[in-house]
């Protein structure tokens, strides 16, 4: 991918959000509501990596369902544009991220995919916060099947 493609993808997102966006070196930060997102070009310049902090750490006693759902999200790395979740071993922060390449970087694909990713990241952040805030005597909030919802909402072309 030439730098023009990543610039065009960011310009399309900028127009969609009504915000002035530009890469500073190889990254761009954007706030959607109160959620910060990072958009970074990879070293080869042929992919964009979008990420968002979704929690400061795992809940103290995560439910089995939450752990299963987070592990299932690891398969996102196998598909262009499908979100995954990772934990920073130094800080404990949980981040959602997705990698976009090729046809996913042209308008309107990238702005559409970014909006879906932003909605996914917010739902995941809300779910993690709800589980963190649930007392041990209360049942943990059940999943709204975040991973399935993500798949059925168009993250993956079927």
Predicted regions and their residues:
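Charge-rich, low-complexity N-terminal segments
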Residues: 1-38, 78, 86
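Hydrophobic residues embedded in beta-strands of well-ordered beta-sheets
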Residues: 28, 46-48, 92-94
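A short acidic-to-branched-hydrophobic micro-motif
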Residues: 41, 46-56
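Short, internal acidic amphipathic alpha-helical interface segments
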Residues: 53-97
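A mid-sequence interfacial segment
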Residues: 84-116
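A contiguous, mid-protein "functional segment" used to position or interact
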Residues: 104-138
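Short, highly charged C-terminal tails/helix-capping segments
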Residues: 129-158
């Amino acid at each position: 991918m030439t730098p023009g493609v990543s610039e065009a993808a960011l310009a399309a997102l900028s127009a969609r959000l009504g915000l002035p966006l530009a890469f500073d070196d190889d990254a761009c930060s954007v706030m959607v509501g109160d959620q910060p997102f990072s958009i970074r070009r990879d070293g080869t310049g042929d992919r964009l990596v979008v990420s968002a902090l979704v929690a400061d750490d795992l809940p103290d006693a995560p439910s089995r369902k939450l752990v299963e759902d987070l592990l299932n999200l690891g398969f996102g790395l196998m598909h262009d544009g499908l979100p995954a979740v990772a934990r920073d071993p130094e800080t404990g922060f949980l981040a959602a991220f997705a990698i976009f390449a090729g046809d996913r970087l042209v308008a309107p694909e990238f702005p559409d995919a970014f909006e879906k990713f932003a909605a996914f990241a917010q739902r995941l952040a809300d779910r993690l916060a709800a589980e963190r805030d649930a007392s041990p005597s209360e049942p943990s909030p059940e999943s709204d099947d975040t991973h399935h919802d993500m798949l059925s909402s168009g993250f993956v072309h079927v």
